From Swiss-Prot:
Family label: Belongs to the bacterial ribosomal protein bL25 family. CTC subfamily.
BP-aspect Gene Ontology terms: translation
Natural source organism: Oceanobacillus iheyensis (strain DSM 14371 / CIP 107618 / JCM 11309 / KCTC 3954 / HTE831)
Keyword entries, A-Z: Ribonucleoprotein, Ribosomal protein, RNA-binding, rRNA-binding
Biased composition (Acidic residues): 183-197, 206-215
Classification via Pfam families: Ribosomal_L25p, Ribosomal_TL5_C
A Gene Ontology molecular function term of the record: 5S rRNA binding
Descriptive protein name: Large ribosomal subunit protein bL25
Lineage: Bacteria, Bacillati, Bacillota, Bacilli, Bacillales
HAMAP family: Ribosomal_bL25_CTC (MF_01334)
InterPro entries: Rbsml_bL25/Gln-tRNA_synth_N, Ribosomal_bL25/Gln-tRNA_synth, Ribosomal_bL25_b-dom, Ribosomal_bL25_C, Ribosomal_bL25_long, Ribosomal_L25_dom, Ribosomal_uL5_bac-type
Domain of life: Bacteria
Role according to the record: This is one of the proteins that binds to the 5S RNA in the ribosome where it forms part of the central protuberance.
Gene that encodes it: rplY
UniProt keyword RNA-binding, yes or no: yes
Region spans: Disordered: 170-215
């Protein structure tokens, strides 16, 4: 079920008007989609953050614009890196009966056996691409890694799909692995490599020249 979010049309697109919108606690946004003319709106910043936090990044939002509503997903957003405030948002109009491709967060659950033995859990990807109808898009994909030993890994092919969606990534792609712990021997090797003096280019030739001159 889509969560409701109120929006207001934006007619004045000047910088000064946009600044006033942000000062009032709202976020300038654009609504667009396949065969849809873009519409400029604004939404309450707190309401948008709360919606994404409570419902997830891929939540279906019923955007209420005046006397009409449209089903959308938050496609992109911009944040002020200094003030940590929302600057802009993009909403993509979705067709509830059509499949779409979206990135879904991957969460590793549990402590691996390998970590208890000093191993290190590696997660090369934090999102994977899936295909599904809007209502079937999972909020996240949870992978139980508690049985992994040192040297074990989980690939896309190992993920149990619990729902009506398809994973589009290469089945052989690794999404989690446990690497061996770093040993003292590894550290000693690193120290030797770091302390080794670099070989001078041409040093061998210089020595050969000196020997020739001394003959």
């Amino acid at each position: 079920m889509a969560v409701k979010l109120n929006a207001t049309k934006r007619e004045d697109l000047t910088k000064s008007a946009t600044k006033q919108i942000r000062l009032s606690g709202r976020v300038p946004a654009v609504v667009y989609g396949k065969a849809k003319d873009p519409k400029n709106v604004s939404v309450d910043s707190v309401d948008l953050v709360k919606t994404v936090r409570d419902e997830g990044r891929n939540a279906i939002i019923s955007l209420q614009v005046e006397n009409s509503s449209v089903d959308v997903m938050l496609h992109d957003y911009q944040i002020d890196p200094i003030k940590d405030e929302l600057l802009h948002a993009d909403f993509y109009v979705v067709n509830m009966s059509e499949e779409m491709d979206v990135n879904v967060a991957v969460r590793l659950d549990g402590e691996t056996k390998g970590e208890k033995e000093g191993g290190v859990l590696q997660q090369p990807f934090y999102e994977i691409l899936v295909r599904a109808k809007p209502n079937n898009i999972p909020e996240e994909i949870v992978i139980d890694v508690s049985d992994l030993d040192v040297g074990d890994s989980v690939s896309v092919a190992d993920i149990k799909v619990d729902g009506n969606y398809e994973i589009l990534e290469d089945p052989d792609t690794s999404v989690a692995s446990v690497t061996p712990p770093t040993t003292e021997e590894d550290l000693d090797t690193d120290d030797v490599d770091e302390n080794a003096e670099p070989e001078l280019v041409g040093a061998e030739n210089d020595s050969a020249d000196e020997e020739s001159e001394n003959k």
